[in-house]
């Protein structure tokens, strides 16, 4: 059998088919990032699996991709493709095996998990239709070179009876789900499957109380754990013996929802940045608009992490917002929850955040970051461990880095360039600060006072501001500037207008419309953070709850009221953390209030 990565032949369009003989690999080679297949900045999948080939075929021949999935059989539940040049979303229809709608060349062919395709299912590309058979191209099935000039891997029998088309596999223990075609025509197509609502229920459970969490159960010899303890003590929540479980189906639904919503947010971001009237709704200083658009054009694929806030229970799964410019929760999900499990958990479940730091390291390896990264954090004890967690990921990815606590160490050299206390040039930054903080500094300056963004290149007292770092053209900042668009709640009404009544969205508007009056609504400032300045209003116009904060003067949006569930007596918020969103979704942390 040819070793892993051997070229076996070509599919139509000159798309290469590679050997996926994992047994030929060094068993000690566990660098997951090395197995990620990219074309330019576009992630294709895990080398050299069937999903990677199918996505690469669509990308090279049609300029479209489907969203990332955990297993090949899950593709059959997707209902759109993304056009890579402009993030447009195109409809994708699924037709069951035995459908009156004939398969066609270029369509995806999907298998259920089981038999030869145990656990994973399978996907192939239909390359040719003949009278009583079809030809397909695929990866991870054949492991020998194709004959010269042959651009298909297998032929499958096609039976036409009573105007319906049925395909029969060459394996006798597999099930073909059907084929998927990019078309607006929904005749004979399947609706998107619903997950059983009971599968989304969050269950409460308790550990036996044996004093596992009395005293110093975190290891303060580890600098990262020590930083967490300095901020929070040896505390994970108010009751460390209480924990919560979700089903595997719910975990997969969260992954699917996060991937799908991320693409929807990108699609909406593209719409906003092409329309001045929409962009004006975000209250972003107009002097930044050209830079925003340039950031989107140049750095669309440079996002490392983000966080979506969901509500999940028997009613369904709804997204509240996308914290696309967020630096928090990595340590809690990727480390502290693991240490909690090691200390007291003896069940068969797993932490969905396990391996988070590996995913982050993989994202950094495929980023455009420069060899040395300055990690910029506020002078805040909680941000100490946020910064240290990311520094560990950068180190694992092979980057050198330095944490800057506050801005006091920075100054300008004689040429007006920014340098740190060691005299090192600052040209690549990962930050814990929100971009909104920098924009607040711009709002303090009259836009008519300067010809461009008011960035200092010197100061009598050497006082460096945040905008003097983040908005310097030569400084590469993660997360990119464009993430202020999906991270601003003004995008929520736009999302609703683009995808009305989508299963994961809540009705949201810039005014209280008739539907919101009937459902009740939440009043949220468009750039608010940490749950500040939110009002909850019932369908009887009764104020249910109200929070204070510093965002009271901001423009508001009005979002359909969708209250958090109570589980085991506590109000529960499930937070899905789509770290490394361009490659993988990872982590599910619980926040209990």
Where in this protein do the model-derived segments appear?
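...with weaker cross-activation on analogous glycine-rich loops/strands in unrelated enzymes
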Residues: 76-143
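Preference for protein termini
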Residues: 187-593
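Extracytoplasmic/secreted proteins, especially bacterial periplasmic and envelope-associated proteins
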Residues: 49-56, 104, 125, 175
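Aromatic- and glycine-rich peptidoglycan recognition patches
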Residues: 118-190
């Amino acid at each position: 059998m040819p070793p892993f990565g051997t070229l076996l032949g070509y599919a139509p369009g000159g798309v290469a088919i590679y050997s996926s003989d994992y047994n030929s690999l060094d068993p000690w080679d566990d660098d997951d990032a090395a197995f990620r297949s990219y074309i330019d900045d576009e992630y294709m999948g895990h080398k050299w699996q069937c999903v990677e080939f199918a996505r690469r075929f669509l990308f090279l021949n049609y300029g479209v991709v489907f969203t990332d999935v955990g297993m090949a059989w899950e593709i059959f539940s997707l209902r759109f493709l993304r056009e890579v040049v402009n993030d447009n979303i195109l409809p994708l229809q699924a037709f069951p095996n035995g459908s009156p709608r004939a398969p066609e060349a270029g369509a995806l062919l999907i298998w259920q998990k089981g038999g030869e395709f145990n656990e994973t299912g399978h996907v192939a590309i239909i390359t040719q239709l003949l009278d009583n058979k079809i030809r397909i191209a695929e990866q991870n099935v054949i492991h020998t070179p194709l004959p010269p000039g042959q651009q298909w891997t297998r032929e499958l029998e096609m039976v036409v009876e009573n105007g319906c088309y049925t395909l029969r596999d060459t394996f006798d223990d597999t099930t073909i789900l059907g084929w998927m075609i990019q078309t607006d025509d929904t005749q004979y197509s399947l609706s998107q499957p619903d997950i059983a609502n009971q599968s989304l229920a969050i269950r409460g459970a308790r550990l036996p109380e044996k004093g596992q969490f009395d005293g110093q159960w975190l290891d303060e010899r580890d600098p990262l754990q020590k930083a967490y303890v300095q901020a929070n003590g040896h505390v994970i929540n108010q009751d460390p013996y209480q924990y919560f479980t979700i089903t595997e189906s719910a975990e997969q639904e969260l992954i699917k929802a996060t991937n799908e919503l991320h693409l929807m947010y990108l699609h909406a971001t593209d719409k906003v940045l092409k329309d001045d009237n929409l962009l004006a709704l975000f209250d972003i200083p107009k002097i930044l608009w050209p830079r925003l658009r340039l950031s989107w054009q140049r750095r669309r694929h440079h996002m490392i992490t983000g966080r979506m806030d969901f509500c999940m229970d028997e009613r369904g799964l709804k997204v509240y917002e996308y914290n696309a410019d967020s630096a928090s929760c990595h340590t809690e999900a990727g480390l502290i929850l693991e240490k909690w499990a090691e200390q007291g958990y003896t069940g068969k479940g797993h932490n969905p955040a396990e391996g988070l730091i590996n995913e982050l390291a993989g994202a950094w390896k495929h980023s455009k970051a420069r060899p040395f990264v300055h990690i910029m954090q506020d002078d805040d004890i909680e941000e100490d461990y946020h910064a240290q967690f990311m520094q560990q990921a950068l180190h694992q990815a092979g980057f050198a880095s330095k944490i800057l606590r506050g801005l006091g160490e920075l100054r300008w050299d004689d040429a007006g360039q920014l340098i740190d206390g060691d005299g090192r040039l600052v040209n690549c930054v990962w930050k814990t600060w929100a971009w909104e903080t920098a924009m607040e500094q711009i709002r303090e300056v009259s836009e008519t006072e300067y010809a461009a963004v008011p960035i200092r290149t010197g100061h009598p007292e050497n006082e460096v501001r945040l905008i003097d770092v983040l908005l310097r053209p030569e400084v590469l900042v993660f997360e990119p500037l464009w993430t202020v668009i999906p991270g601003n709640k003004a995008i929520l009404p736009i999302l609703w207008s683009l995808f009305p009544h989508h299963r994961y969205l809540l009705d949201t508007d810039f005014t209280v419309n008739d539907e919101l009056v009937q459902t009740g609504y939440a009043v949220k400032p468009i750039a608010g953070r940490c749950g500040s300045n939110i009002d909850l209003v019932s369908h009887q116009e009764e104020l249910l709850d109200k929070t204070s904060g510093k965002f009271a003067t901001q423009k508001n949006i009005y979002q359909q009221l969708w209250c958090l569930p109570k589980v085991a007596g506590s109000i529960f918020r499930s937070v899905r953390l789509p770290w490394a969103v361009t490659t993988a979704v990872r982590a599910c942390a619980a926040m209990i209030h």
